[in-house]
Amino acid sequence: MKFERHSPSSLNLFCASREMFVLEKILGRRQPVGAPAHRGTAVEDGVTTGLMNPDASIESCVDVALKKYDTITALSGDKRREDYRSTIPDMVRMALEELRPYGIPSHTQQFVSWKPEGLAYPIVGYLDYRWEQHGTLVDLKTTEKLPSSIKVPHARQVALYASMTGDNIDARLTYTTPKKRATYQLENVREHLKALHQIALRCEAFLAQSDDPEYFIRTTAPDFESFYWGGPARQIGFEVWGF
């Protein structure tokens, strides 16, 4: 069984749905990327263009995002494709209005890696934007509904970035919908990082039970009513677990 590293997203998945973790990370049956995730990638491309080029018009940044979206969804069968595409211009605009006052980022998509004592594999990730000159980093999230505070899985993710970029870093998350935006400062970084570490330790203990992927099928049982098993994932789950 091949396993080389953790990521905040995989560890959050391990917490949220052990069986989906088995399907994707142990069995290698990755689910098709849906329109929401593709939209997030495209919006980030447009926003990065606008941040790195302060004189670029909003329209040109939107064009970058739409071209990216059209490219990565060209073969997508997601019926929501056009609906999500239509929200990209407003999301790019919202995010740039929020983040351009920070200036030009010193880093984009900066790789971070952490391997604390007791872990066999490192936890790695890529932070979206860092302004070294301000001691600030921001992770950008696209969403349908604006949250009133930082979501816990996102807090764990950004705590990793913050801890790997300096003791006094001001870590923030910016959420954007087509009509609203908000930026929240991450607090309790050490506590969230500790939680991520503990989840990783339990994940490795789970993986250490066997080198045989079939073992994890025999010892787990998916809840197919969970939203994790919507769409094609449910049929794949039926085939893998046999019920």
PLM regions with names:
Residues 1-126, 233, 238-243:
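Metal-dependent nuclease catalytic cores that hydrolyze phosphodiester bonds in DNA/RNA
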Residues 25, 140-142, 173-175:
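Residue-level recognition of conserved beta-strand positions in structured domain cores
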Residues 29, 144-146, 179-180:
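Short, surface-exposed beta-strand-loop junctions and turns on beta-sheet-rich folds
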Residues 36, 147-154, 186-189, 193:
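Flexible, glycine- and charge-enriched loops at secondary-structure boundaries
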Residues 100-104, 132-136, 165-169:
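Short glycine/proline-enriched coil/turn segments at helix->beta-strand junctions
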Residues 112-158, 163-164:
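Non-catalytic protein-protein interaction segments used by genome-maintenance enzymes to assemble
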Residues 165-243:
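Metal-dependent nuclease catalytic regions and adjoining charged, substrate-binding loops involved
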